[in-house]
Amino acid sequence: MFARAFPLLRPLIGVIDAEQAHDLSVRALEMLPLPACGPDDPRLAVEAFGLKFPNPVGMAAGFDKDARVPDAVLRLGFGFVEVGGVTRQPQPGNPRPRVFRLPQDEAVINRYGLNSSGMEAVRQRLAKRRRAGIVGINLGANKESVDRIGDYVALLRSLGPHAEFVTLNISSPNTPGLRDLQGRAFLEELLDRTLDARAKANLATRVLLKIAPDLDDLQLDDIVAVALRRPIDGMIVSNTTTARPESLKDKAQAKEAGGLSGRPIFRPSTVKLAKTWLRVEGRFPLIGVGGIASGADALAKIEAGANLVQLYTALIYQGPALLQEIKDTLEAAAPPEGLPAIVGRAARDWASSAC
């Protein structure tokens, strides 16, 4: 129903403010009585992080920031959903306007600044869930925090019991200084403190790390080396980029500050994914995100090293029908032994290609 209505609503969505359009989409999912999708083909099933996913396609963080509609998103047919980013204390984020469409590029620039209703509000919503389905939570530090690592620890303790996985988001370009946590010393302390908190709380929640696409090879080497020496469960590659490719057509909007997402970051994020996969060598799973706008894109991410994929920006332009197109493509491409058999088979080619 929601997918069928999108073509009718698309002209309206395209002319109103981008953030208002996003808010309307969330409200529609809150209000509409969506029927659950039918079961996925068994060939789409994936096991990762010790969890069984009905299909490998997830809704990326950024859509359901305050965990208002995780079950509605799952009913659309996603294999999992990641809510957030969530901060320890409520914060308004950056001043509006802070979201900008680049329709000629099928891209978006955002500088939300981790606007969040806060940890306690999200905890209360998730505690009321009764529906089965895999939900992850993207965790972020408050802009004015004096102990950002302490924020992640508190978020894990509070929200961990209500999620199958949490993501340590240290790669948002819109919180000043947050990407500094990708440096080796900060990252070691972050992982040590959060993983120690998980162990002491006896939580089964998986802990993932989300990195930026703008890392150079030496920075990536450091991050992977630190991660592999600790019981981290996986990585998400990658967040939005601060780069502005010369190929962008919406030149005026491209001048806006913030993180670029959508089709233009598909290649650089997939190259980064492949390079990460070659360094990790299968020791933990990877989620590939960035620029997926078709079934072929999702398949390419898997062949570059992703066990699971996520998308969001392309849905703004193509609507929820894109999800079924992606699943149909993956189902057709899956060998008899399933999608895990093709993970990483093109990683070396991607890693050696130019961004």
Language model regions located:
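C-terminal helical cap(s) of enzyme catalytic domains, especially alpha/beta-barrels
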Residues: 90-106, 244-258, 314-341
